């Protein structure tokens, strides 16, 4: 969280009676730096879930798969198949890509805490796209688990409308 928003966060916690013990890490210049700041506050040898706030529709089944795989294999990254056609665009040219060889990566990306803390001690690399890419640079193999298609990333106004519709549909069941 940006340092300038800490007071607002505390006000929200009071207003909504959010009393679960927690720590808030200061956001960094990039996602890498923000996650690194959060990991510095974390102790122990348990499992850590690193999740995007812009993915509010993660399922309990996805969380369970991530946890169980991270316990057994050290890490777990949810993924869903690509359902649309994909084209590679470069130097003014484009060509189709075999989407059967592609997956979309989601969060929470889940890790044994000491493993991901060690990975985040390496210097920042602009090629890091997510936590899995940070760990992968250490030589670790990334374990993909089944994600859930509803766990969309809310980037555009249309994404927010879609999420609202999914929540309305879920609550009307």
Positions of PLM-derived features:
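Glycine-rich beta-alpha junction loops
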Residues: 1, 81-84, 149, 158
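Conserved N-terminal catalytic core of the sugar/cofactor nucleotidyltransferase
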Residues: 1-45
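Short glycine-rich anion-binding loops that position phosphate/pyrophosphate groups of nucleotides
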Residues: 4-5, 30, 53-56, 83
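Hydrophobic packing residues within well-ordered alpha-helices of enzyme cores
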Residues: 9-13, 66, 116, 163
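Residue-level signal for inorganic ion chemistry
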Residues: 38, 51-52, 81, 112, ...
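Conserved core of the sugar-phosphate nucleotidyltransferase
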Residues: 57-145, 173
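Hydrophobic helical membrane-anchoring modules
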Residues: 151-173
């Amino acid at each position: 969280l940006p340092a300038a928003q800490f007071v607002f966060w505390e006000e929200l916690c009071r207003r909504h009676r959010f009393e679960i013990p927690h720590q808030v890490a200061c956001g960094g210049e990039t996602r890498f730096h923000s996650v690194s700041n959060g990991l510095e506050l974390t102790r122990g040898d348990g499992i850590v879930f690193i999740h995007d706030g812009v993915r509010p529709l993660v399922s309990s089944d996805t969380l369970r798969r991530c946890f169980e795989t991270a316990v057994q294999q050290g890490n777990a990254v949810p993924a869903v198949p690509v359902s649309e056609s994909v084209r590679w665009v470069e130097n003014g040219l484009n060509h189709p890509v075999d989407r059967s060889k592609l997956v979309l990566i989601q969060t929470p990306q889940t890790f044994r805490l000491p493993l991901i803390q060690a990975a985040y001690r390496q210097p920042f690399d602009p090629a890091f796209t997510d936590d899995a890419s940070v760990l992968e640079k250490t030589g670790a193999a990334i374990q993909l688990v089944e994600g859930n298609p509803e766990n969309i990333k809310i980037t555009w106004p249309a994404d927010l409308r879609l999420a609202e519709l999914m929540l309305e549909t879920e609550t009307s069941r």
